[in-house]
Amino acid sequence: MAHKKGAGSTKNGRDSNAKRLGVKRFGGQRVKAGNILVRQRGMKFTPGLNVGCGKDFTLYALTDGIVNFDYKNAQQKRINIIG
């Protein structure tokens, strides 16, 4: 019986590209309409005042203003654009 594995293909050796998720604009930062605030999987952050949500759950600014983070309730973080 051979003690070496044959030179066939392996089932491992794959990895997906990083998706660059996360917060892109932080609290207190000035933003313009259309700026991306958060890239996320699922609704980790919920859209608040003057914030829109894309089909991939990306949150973006609807108006110019300053980013503000708060809590909708004990679990859910919300992002607003003030002013």
Swiss-Prot record:
Major subcellular location class: plastid
Swiss-Prot/TrEMBL keywords: Chloroplast, Plastid, Ribonucleoprotein, Ribosomal protein
UniProt GO BP: translation
A GO cellular component entry from the record: mitochondrial large ribosomal subunit
Localization, UniProt: Plastid, Chloroplast
InterPro entries: Ribosomal_bL27, Ribosomal_bL27_CS
Gene3D superfamilies in the cross-refs: 2.40.50.100
Entry-linked SUPFAM superfamilies: Ribosomal L27 protein-like
Gene Ontology molecular function: structural constituent of ribosome
One Pfam family of this chain: Ribosomal_L27
Top-rank taxon: Eukaryota
Disordered: region residues: 1-24
Similarity comment: family membership: Belongs to the bacterial ribosomal protein bL27 family.
Record's protein name: Large ribosomal subunit protein bL27c
Source organism per UniProt: Trieres chinensis (Marine centric diatom)
Gene from which this protein is expressed: rpl27
